[in-house]
Design a protein with these regions (language model features):
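A glycine/threonine-rich phosphate-anchoring loop and its flanking beta-alpha core
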Residues: 96-195
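A short, small-residue-rich loop immediately preceding and capping a beta-strand
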Residues: 73-94, 98-108
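Gly/Ser/Thr-rich loops at beta-strand to alpha-helix junctions
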Residues: 7, 28-35, 84-88, 110, ...
Length: 364
C-alpha cells in the first residue's frame, strides 16, 4: 500500500502508474466534483476511464449497487473509489471479484476502513463483512479532506476514540479468555490514536497538520488489521453497537447516520460499562488486572466533552435511534460478532438489565 499526498503536480506517482491503463472510477453525487477533477488529470496522462456514477444522495452498498459497478468494470485494469466509507468498500469488493487492484481518493477523514481487508456490505438486509483486497494506493488531498462537512471529521474522530474501547476489549479477552494479542498491531494503533488525540485542539480548528494526524490514525487502523489478520485493533464493543443499530436503520428504510458518530456514542457506553464494573467492585476471573487497566482509561465525561467540541452527538436519540432499539442493542449487540468484549462480559455476569437504566439515562 502506498499513501500519497497531493503536491503541486498532483499525485505524480499514481498518475504515472495509471498511464495507459483503464481505470474504473467509482463516485457519487457528493464526490462528483473531485472525481471529475482526477478523471481529467488522469486522462491528460493517457489513462482510459470507465466512469461508475451513482446518483444516490445516500448510497447504500447493496448487492445490486455492487453488481452495477462489477459490470461497469469489466474491462478495467484498476478500480479507483472517490469517496470514503461506502464507495471504498464497494470498490474493494469489485476489485476482489475482478481480481484487479484498487485505490481510493479519500474525500473525508470520516472512518477507519480505507486500508482494511474488510468491506462492509448489505446483504438481505443484514450488514456483512467480506474479506477483500486492500487498496494499493490511498490518495489524500488535505484541501479536499478539510473542506468536508465538519460532522464527517467529527465522525472520523469518533472512530479513533473508539480505539480506547476496542483495544481494551482485546486486553479483556486476553485476560479472561486467553486470546492472543498481536503486539505490533496493538502498539501501532495505540500510538496513532495517541497522536491524533494529542492533536485535538488543531482538529477543532480544522488545521492541516491535525487533519493529517487524524488521517494517519484512520489509515493505521487498516494497516494494523492487515498485520494481525483480523479487525481486533480497530473494532470492538463500540463497533458492535454501531453495526446493530445500522441494521435496524436499514430494516426500517431510514437514513443511516455516519458510522463514526454511532461508534463515538458506543465508545461512551462501553467506557461507562467498564467503569461500572470497577466502581461496583464486581468480581470475575481476572477482575483485578482488568480494573488496573480501567484506571488508565479516560472517563466517559472526558471523551464526551471532546466530542461536543467536535460537534459530535453524544446521545443515540440525536441520531434518530428509537429507545426500544437501544434497549434491544444493550441486550443483543454482543451477538453481532463472535468476539469477546465488555458487552459479552456484562451479559455473562447477568448485569444487562441492572445497568440498562443508567446507560439509557446518560446516552439516550
Amino acid at each position: 500500500m502506498y499513501v500519497e499526498y497531493r503536491h503541486e503536480g498532483g499525485f505524480e506517482y499514481f498518475f504515472n502508474k495509471m498511464a495507459k491503463k483503464t481505470v474504473a472510477v467509482m463516485y457519487d453525487v457528493n464526490t462528483k466534483p473531485y472525481a471529475l477533477q482526477i478523471i481529467n488529470e488522469m486522462q491528460s496522462r493517457g489513462t482510459s476511464i470507465l466512469p461508475v456514477y451513482y446518483s444516490d444522495e445516500e448510497l447504500v452498498p447493496t448487492e445490486d449497487k455492487c453488481e452495477y459497478a462489477y459490470q461497469m468494470a469489466a474491462d478495467a485494469d484498476y478500480v479507483l473509489a472517490v469517496g470514503s466509507g461506502t464507495l471504498n468498500d464497494m470498490a474493494k469488493s469489485v476489485s476482489t471479484r475482478r481480481d484487479i487492484p484498487c485505490g481510493v481518493l479519500a474525500t473525508a477523514a470520516s472512518m477507519d476502513g480505507y486500508c482494511s481487508k474488510g468491506a462492509a456490505l448489505m446483504r438481505d438486509g443484514f450488514k456483512v463483512t467480506d474479506m477483500v483486497h486492500t487498496p494499493e494506493d490511498v490518495l489524500i488531498d488535505l484541501d479536499i479532506v478539510r473542506s468536508a462537512p465538519g460532522i464527517m471529521t467529527a465522525a472520523g474522530f469518533g472512530d479513533i476514540i473508539g480505539k480506547y474501547t476496542c483495544l481494551m476489549d482485546w486486553k479483556l479477552a486476553h485476560i479472561v479468555k486467553g486470546e492472543d494479542i498481536h503486539e505490533q498491531a496493538f502498539s501501532l494503533m495505540e500510538q496513532a490514536r495517541a497522536e491524533c488525540v494529542n492533536a485535538f485542539d488543531g482538529l477543532v480548528k480544522n488545521e492541516s497538520g491535525a487533519i493529517a494526524k487524524l488521517m494517519n490514525a484512520l489509515i493505521t487502523a487498516g494497516t494494523s488489521m492487515a498485520i494481525c489478520g483480523n479487525s481486533r485493533p480497530a473494532s470492538g464493543s463500540e463497533h458492535h453497537q454501531s453495526h446493530f443499530l445500522e441494521m435496524d436503520f436499514v430494516r426500517r428504510g431510514e437514513k443511516i447516520p455516519l458510522h463514526g458518530l454511532k461508534v463515538a456514542i458506543g465508545t461512551l457506553v462501553s467506557i461507562e460499562l467498564y467503569h461500572y464494573l470497577k466502581d461496583q467492585n464486581i468480581k470475575f476471573d481476572g477482575s483485578r488486572e482488568v480494573f488496573a487497566l480501567i484506571e488508565k482509561m479516560p472517563s466517559a465525561e472526558t471523551l464526551k466533552a471532546m466530542l461536543l467540541k467536535m460537534g459530535c452527538p453524544v446521545r443515540f436519540s440525536e441520531l434518530g435511534v428509537r429507545r426500544e432499539t437501544m434497549e434491544e442493542m444493550l441486550e443483543k449487540a454482543y451477538t453481532v460478532r463472535d468476539r469477546y468484549t465488555i458487552l459479552t462480559l456484562i451479559h455473562e455476569l447477568g448485569l444487562t438489565k441492572e445497568i440498562a437504566p443508567l446507560i439509557l439515562s446518560k446516552y439516550y
